[in-house]
Amino acid sequence: MTATDGPAQDRRPGAVLVTGGASGLGAAVALAVRDAGGRPFVLDLVSPSSEVDHELVDLADRGAAAAAVGRAAERMGRLDGVVTAAGVDACGPLGSVPADAWERVVAVNLLGTAAVVRAALPHLERTAGKVVTVASTLGLRALPDATAYCASKFGVVGFTRALAAETAGRVGVTLLVPGGMHTAFFDGRPEQYKPAADAKLNRPEDVAQAVLFALCQPPGCEARELLVAPSTESSWP
């Protein structure tokens, strides 16, 4: 099978690895891939509620993340796409957030993204596949009490732009910059760090359609950057 055969050519998503696919945007992406005729494979700390192939892994563990990618590719027989939707946060002033919690945000959001993509690249190069990284509007604009999250997501932005230049002509790379969404991401935060009760946030299912759009572009055609935010997004511009 050549790089232009199969799912990429008929504009279906194919075999897609989704990190953080047990909840939120990742879960919505996994279902969107399945509904579009693709085969999602989820990597997460917990099992997804939907019946999709998955493996439990802590993406902060570089070796475990890379090994999980290899097993996923072996089980699916190929990789046509990777979506790095896993993400955590630790809100609060820099001096108040425990160092371990702060560093875990960077380990999962940035280093975990790099570990997964690094392990997936050889498989994606064989299929002219796609990478969609998930940053945030807080990867473009900084807010107080969000040093860990901003550091990780600004890092994802830079990583993705450099990756796109590095793999041009071999792997399609898309940077997704989502605004606020109705997910469990904000659960457990102190009230001052939660969206207001009347906040107008996007549905993850709608944002997942933007991811699907990027995944289904033919080789040589790339959606390099997608910013998908509520029309009243407070963190953008």
PLM features: residue spans?
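The beta1-alpha1 cofactor-binding region of Rossmann-like NAD(H)/NADP(H)-dependent oxidoreductases
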Residues: 57-67, 99
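Conserved NAD(P)H cofactor-binding loop of Rossmann-fold oxidoreductase domains
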Residues: 85-90
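Substrate-binding pocket helix/loop in short-chain dehydrogenase/reductase
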Residues: 93-94, 101-103
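C-terminal helical subdomain
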Residues: 169, 175-176, 195-236
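Residue(s) in the substrate-gating loop at a strand-loop-helix junction
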Residues: 136
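Canonical Rossmann dinucleotide-binding motif of NAD(H)/NADP(H)-dependent dehydrogenases/reductases
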Residues: 3, 7-41
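Active-site helix of classical SDR
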Residues: 117, 152
